[in-house]
Amino acid sequence: MDPLYDGSEFAFVDKIFGGAVPKQYIPAVEKGAKETLDKGLIAGYPMIGVQVTLLDGSYHSVDSSELAFKVATSQAIKDVIPKAKPVLLEPIYEVNVFAPDSFMGDIMGDLNSRRGRVLGMEQSERTGISVVKAQVPLAEMSDYVTALRSITQGQGVFNRQFYTYEEVPHKQAEEIIAAHKTQE
């Protein structure tokens, strides 16, 4: 297993030589890897940015089957994941908040309190409306419509779109993992 740095979620590479694993079982190996990563081994969340490379294996004419190769692949991934020191990621959204200039300080303070990064602000002297651009974890945005209405007396609006994934801060990651373990 190797990390992918190109933004891909999953890649499978077959480097088997000499038929150690017959070609008909290679798709079962790939499927076993993908299914295991999709189930998620950290707090039940899918693992992304992973390349799985099949380097070797063995075949037995009686005992080998697609299911056996899927199960063996799944177990191999479960064995290697802890050694890879995986991290919990969270979606980060680009957020644009539109509101009258007089509310910008409170809006930026609120975004910062949500672990957001304010990237900048553009003012329009003609309209009196400003735009704050920020990047904010999705987990912090669940009540943002209500908060923005309160801050701006109903005069603010926002839009958001997915930007990237980033590592969850250590303290929050521990809380998420602990909560998942109590649900199991």
What are the residue ranges of the model-derived segments?
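Accessory interaction regions appended to the cores of large information-processing enzymes
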Residues: 1-184
